Regions:
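Iron-sulfur cluster-binding cysteine motifs and their immediate structural context
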Residues: 52, 227-251, 268-295
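Auxiliary alpha/beta "docking" domains used to position bulky ligands
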Residues: 36-221, 260, 269
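Alpha-helical scaffold domains
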Residues: 260-346
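A short, charged helix-loop
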Residues: 208-211, 247, 252-255
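Short hydrophobic targeting helices and cationic amphipathic motifs
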Residues: 4-6, 10, 19-22, 35
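Cationic, low-complexity basic patches in intrinsically disordered or flexible, solvent-exposed regions
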Residues: 13
Length: 346
């Protein structure tokens, strides 16, 4: 380990060692600033810090207009398969051009966070909740982590301007993740990582700082496999990695307002909130390690809930158990609508 690596490592622990006598640590200010030199060094330390914060992977790409991805988004919107998700058409230019989001944007830092749970629902007859919603809302968790990463960048460089994005702003997250070398787009439209599968959250920092950009060799490792397409109970996965959003169980149970169409009766396979069927059958998700994020751990109470418990589930139960959870998006009323629809399913 050279002196630079030692200094950086010790700064992370808020101590600096006398290089001539490593047994005598000396405390230094927590906000000590190092000015790094060179795009390569800056990029290296940003990626290292991302991993230290708990992200599972980090890549960097140039902030620029993405004409191919903009065209694909337009085709999807024009096809009329977005259902009631009209917001997808908003801020179209910003979705494909980060320079419309951050003035003078030069780099997009993409991060990946595993959320695969170590525990599952106990009762196989109980209504199923998507794994992404087991714990605290990922928007909150990842935003906190990204803000820490942003603060770190400000400490190792000249003043930097930027914004953090987690699935709640006009950003083509999967496209940026591919450019950063974090994975490829599967036939179910999900980003798939060879190391982490597809039970992953994505986030970005768009900043006006130039960095060294990853140049990944993007490969499609889906091959001839069609398990996700074959397993989808509503036929929502179309050719060319296109998903019919208006025909997806996740759309009906989370985004859809009003009643769920009668034509979907008998096709939800007991999915109460969201759907993981296309991911559960994916070969790349067969040997996953559970996440290491405490905030994503579920409340043990609802993991133990039986079918009967759900039938007697009250609004006060909902507010207590699912506080700060993704289930707050559909609210108690929406969850009960879904539950009643499932009861008609059988």
């Amino acid at each position: 380990m050279n002196d630079l690596h030692l200094l950086r490592f010790s700064w992370e622990l808020d101590i600096i060692f006398n290089l001539k006598n490593l047994t005598l640590p000396m405390l230094v200010p927590k906000r000590r600033i190092y000015f790094m030199t060179g795009l390569k060094e800056n990029s290296h330390w940003i990626k290292e810090k991302a991993l230290l914060l708990g992200f599972d992977a980090c890549g960097i790409s140039r902030a620029e207009f993405m004409p191919d991805d903009a065209s694909r988004l337009k085709d999807w919107l024009d096809a009329g398969i977005s259902g009631e998700m009209h917001y997808m058409a908003n801020h179209f230019e910003k979705r494909s051009n980060p320079q419309k989001l951050v003035e003078g944007a030069k780099s997009v830092i993409s991060v990946l966070l595993n959320y695969y749970p170590g525990e599952k629902q106990k009762d196989p007859a109980s209504p199923v909740i998507s794994k992404y919603a087991y714990g605290e809302d990922y928007h909150f968790v990842m935003k906190r982590m990204l803000k820490e990463l942003m603060a770190y960048i400000g400490e190792i460089s000249d003043p930097v301007n930027g914004r953090a994005f987690v699935d709640s702003a006009p950003v083509l997250e999967r496209a940026w993740a591919v450019r950063a070398g974090l994975g490829w787009i599967g036939k179910n439209g999900m980003l798939i990582s060879k190391e982490h599968g597809s039970f992953i959250f994505l986030g970005e920092l768009v900043i006006d700082m130039e960095l060294e950009y990853d140049k990944p060799e993007v490969k499609d490792y889906c091959g001839t496999c069609t398990r996700c397409i074959d397993a989808c109970p509503t036929g929502a996965i179309l050719p060319e990695r296109v998903v019919d959003g208006s025909n997806c169980i996740s759309y009906f149970t989370i985004e859809k307002k009003g009643d769920i169409p009668a034509k979907m009766k008998g096709r939800f396979r007991n999915r109460l909130f969201g759907c993981d069927i296309c991911q559960d059958v994916c070969p790349w998700n067969k040997r996953l390690k559970p996440h290491n994020i405490p905030e994503f751990n579920p409340d043990p109470e609802w993991l133990e809930m039986s079918e009967e418990d759900w039938a007697n589930f009250s609004e006060s139960d909902f507010n207590r158990i699912f506080k700060d959870s993704p289930l707050e998006r559909t609210k108690y009323k929406g969850l009960m609508r879904n539950l009643k629809f499932l009861q008609k399913d059988f």
